[in-house]
Amino acid sequence: MSGKTVTRADLAESVFRKVGLSRTESAELVETVIDEICNAIVRGESVKLSSFATFQVRDKNERIGRNPKTGEEVPISPRRVMTFKASNVLKQRVLKAHLSRRAKQKQTGTAS
C-alpha cells in the first residue's frame, strides 16, 4: 500500500488539471459534490455511483452484546449506521492493481 490519503484538496487539484476549471471553481465543485452526497445520506437516501460504490444508511435493531472482558450480556441500543459497498467494477480494479504490484515485486525480488 502506498499509505497516501487522498484529500479534498487532492481531488480539487485533479479536477483543476483534468477539467480546466480554475482552482477555486474546482474546489467549489468538489465541495458541492460532497455536500450533495452527504445531504442525500442524511435524508436517508441511498447514493449509488455506478462503477464505484453505494452509500446507504441502515437501521440496526436493539440486540444483546457481550462485554469481552467480563462475559456479561449488555444491551446494544438501536442505531443508524452508514454503509459503503464497493461495486464489482471497483473491486476488480483493486484486485487487478494488487496482482500487478505483486507480479512486479516478484520480478524485482522485492516483497512487502
Curated annotation (Swiss-Prot):
This is Integration host factor subunit alpha. This protein is one of the two subunits of integration host factor, a specific DNA-binding protein that functions in genetic recombination as well as in transcriptional and translational control. InterPro entries: Hist_DNA-bd, Histone-like_DNA-bd_CS, IHF-like_DNA-bd_dom_sf, IHF_alpha. GO terms for cellular component: cytosol. The keyword Ribonucleoprotein does not apply. It comes from Sinorhizobium fredii (strain NBRC 101917 / NGR234). NCBIfam families: himA, PRK00285.1. Belongs to the bacterial histone-like protein family.
